[in-house]
A protein has these predicted regions:
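Bacterial Sec-dependent N-terminal signal peptides
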Residues: 1-22
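Terminal presequence/propeptide segments associated with secretion/organelle targeting
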Residues: 17-297
Length: 297
């Protein structure tokens, strides 16, 4: 099935050559899934599950952002530094480039807060909480007589639930998404920060090494990262760009470790995937094999 960039997912696996176990889960379901908790601990997870995601207390998920609505990012400092991929920051880097200052070719570094470059159309989105609204959505469609009527009813109530969030608090955004082929519906509540400034980008020869040819063909050796900073008003709240804004102070930070990892280390990723076929039905897999893969090969 397809996921929009609106819900944080967790992927866990063990890097050991001898054994690997993996999966993809909605964060809201993690606490309920005792087997997932047990398996991750067996693989080496030391952090309690409620430290991964907790809508009532600061947690690791608070450091993970939807970057621009099309990528993932992670907050790594108390002053709002965000790491994301080079290709995710590519358009912002390009926007500030010129013949005199070709930041795509040569890279960019801001040596002070004053040198950081604003990006008017860029934002980062923090997930505040998720809520299962399946019963409410499906009840709105129970009297539908056709699939078309059902779709209209479902879409309508999804939009209503989302709008209710911003009506209660204008700084919040509510989005309802369908999961598991429309058998579950989850509301995600976000807060957006619209003042995001470019801090550092490597040259494209590093950040885009191999370009998309290598991306889809080979293991990559790419410095695929860029660094931005979130700015807020003096109350640490969302604000449009202003010279008076100050660096955002996050509720939770994922600090960078210089110790690295070793073979067999537990590995887990939180983020906003563009799409996944992990929960595709057997009929969907059959369709891909017959009509998609056969035509390609």
């Amino acid at each position: 099935m397809k996921f929009r960039l609106t819900a944080v997912i967790v992927l866990a696996l063990c890097l050991s050559n001898a054994f690997a176990d993996e999966g993809m889960w909605l964060l809201g379901n993690l606490k309920k899934n005792k087997q997932t908790d047990r398996v991750m601990r067996e693989l080496g997870l030391q952090m309690p599950v409620n430290k991964l995601y907790n809508p009532k207390k600061p947690c690791l998920a608070d450091a993970v952002v939807s970057f621009g609505g099309f990528c993932s990012g992670v907050v790594v400092s108390e002053d709002g530094l965000v790491f994301t991929n080079h290709h995710c920051g590519f358009s912002s880097i390009q926007q500030h480039s010129s013949v005199e200052h070709d930041y795509l070719k040569d890279g960019f570094v801001a040596r002070s807060l004053e040198e950081e470059l604003p990006n008017p159309e860029l934002y980062v989105r923090f997930l505040l909480r998720t809520e299962n609204v399946t019963k409410r959505v499906l009840s709105a469609a129970k009297h539908a007589k056709t699939e078309s009527e059902r779709r209209v009813a479902v879409d309508s109530v999804m939009n209503v639930i989302g709008m209710e969030v911003s009506e209660k608090d204008s700084t919040l955004t509510g989005i309802v998404d369908a999961y598991y082929a429309g058998n579950e519906f989850w509301l995600s509540v976000y807060r957006d920060y619209n003042d995001v400034r470019l801090v550092f980008a490597p040259p494209s020869s590093v950040g885009k090494f191999g370009w998309d040819t290598d991306n889809w063909m080979w293991p990559r050796h790419t410095g695929d990262f860029s660094v931005f900073r979130i700015y807020a008003n003096t109350q640490n709240g969302p604000a449009d760009y202003s010279p008076d804004n100050v660096p955002y102070h996050p509720e939770y930070v994922a600090p960078v470790s210089l110790e690295g990892y070793k073979e067999g280390s537990f590995c887990m990723t939180l983020g906003y995937p563009g799409s996944t076929e992990r929960y595709l039905s057997s009929y969907g897999i059959e369709e891909m094999m017959i009509y998609s893969y056969n035509n390609r090969f």
